[in-house]
Amino acid sequence: HATIRRQRQMCIRDSNKVKPNTYKVIKDHPRLIIPFYDTTGKIFAFQGRAFGKEQPKYLTIKLDENKQKVYGLDKVNFQQPIYITEGPIDSLFIDNCLAAGGADLFLKNKIPNENITYIFDNEPRNKEIVKRMYKVIEQDFNVVIWPEDLQLKDVNDMIMSGLTKLELQDIISNNTYSKLSALTKLKYWKKIKEV
């Protein structure tokens, strides 16, 4: 754990020196620094998340360009069912959860698709999210399709509104679909005509 502690200190102390002249300097905003660890506990990337409406919302620096940007690899048990959220903060509220874009490619052949459940943001009018939901369903992954009466945008908003972790897990469990049932549910959930 001393190695991890040293890596965390390096992340905080030298975040602006890791890859000099690689990233354009933009207007500075306060950001939460989120370290990404691999399965051995070694940092391979870190991400700065804006607190307000600043754009870009996320700035990511990868120390190893060959690794996919997947958060939570150091904590997940690949022998158990895995959840995948869009963002690292959402993943903190769900047991055995990763956060990633394109994680389906990363996890191929590691565990069966039916043991992976994607949890996208609750945005039925977002064409990109709906398109990604169709893609993971076609690849035989499970997907959470939020109930229509739930008006909160993402897992973090749900927790901030007062839902407990257990209540959130119940909602996720009761609204996880796959294959034909997922396609049918998604057809009625989405609020856009074409994808």
Label every model-predicted segment.
Residues 37-39, 44, 56, 79-82, ...:
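TOPRIM fold recognition
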Residues 7, 31, 79:
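Short coil/loop residues immediately preceding or within conserved phosphate-binding loops
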Residues 24-26, 69-78:
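A short acidic-Thr-Gly-centered motif at the start of a beta-strand
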Residues 17-19:
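Flexible, glycine/threonine-enriched loop-and-boundary segments that flank and lead into catalytic domains
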Residues 31-37:
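A short, hydrophobic, proline-anchored segment that marks a local hinge/packing element in signaling
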Residues 52-63:
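A short, polar/charged loop-to-alpha-helix boundary motif
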Residues 1-12:
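Single conserved hydrophobic/aromatic residue that forms the stacking wall/gate
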